[in-house]
Regions:
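Cap/insert and terminal regions of metallo-dependent hydrolase folds
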Residues: 69-157
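Conserved acidic
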Residues: 65
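Binuclear metal-dependent hydrolase catalytic cores
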Residues: 1-61, 69-72, 77-78, 136-163
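Structural beta-sheet core signal
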Residues: 61-62, 126
Length: 163
């Protein structure tokens, strides 16, 4: 879909590499004895997957393009993110902006904070920021989120994450 010429000027025939695609849905993938990945599909207009990556004794969970049900957090994603060392969560909107964007397939920073607390995650990284928010607004969101969940940071260019 994303490689449709309407959205992307390069066709598959232009690639010099052999490309193999695998459909991933609700799965457990063993990459090696040390690396395991679990995936869960969730609400987004064109579908989306969240990932839990376990490396040795460390875990990070990546939840993007996620629209939680209106009255609660997605139960499957709560299960997926349990006890993550790092939770990287869609924080595209503020709670008030989210009300006007139902069906867009995104979360609020408030939902991300609730998810971090509910899953006993050690650290939260807010990302997939709304491009209409400026740096001052994102800094305000980050500091407000830290008042609720202290170990919160906003993703930004150049951020390096260590597990």
């Amino acid at each position: 879909y994303m490689m449709n010429p309407i959205f992307w000027p390069v066709s598959f025939d232009d690639f010099k590499a052999n490309l193999n695609f695998h459909t991933i849905e609700d799965e457990k993938l063993k990459i090696s004895d040390l690396i395991n990945i679990k995936t869960k599909p969730h609400g987004h207009p064109n579908g989306a997957l969240s990932f839990r990556v376990e490396i040795n004794d460390k875990t990070f969970t990546y939840i993007t393009d996620c629209e939680h049900p209106e009255s609660h957090l997605n139960k499957q994603l709560i299960d997926l993110a349990q006890n993550s060392d790092i939770l990287i969560h869609d924080a595209h909107f503020t709670g008030s902006d989210l009300l006007n964007h139902k069906g867009w397939g995104h979360s609020s920073w408030e939902q991300a904070v609730k998810m971090a607390k509910k899953t006993n995650s050690k650290e939260l990284i807010l990302f997939h920021h709304n491009p209409l928010y400026n740096d001052k607004q994102l800094s305000h969101i980050e500091s407000t989120a830290q008042q609720v969940f202290e170990k919160t940071i906003s993703a930004k260019q150049g951020l390096v994450i260590y597990l």
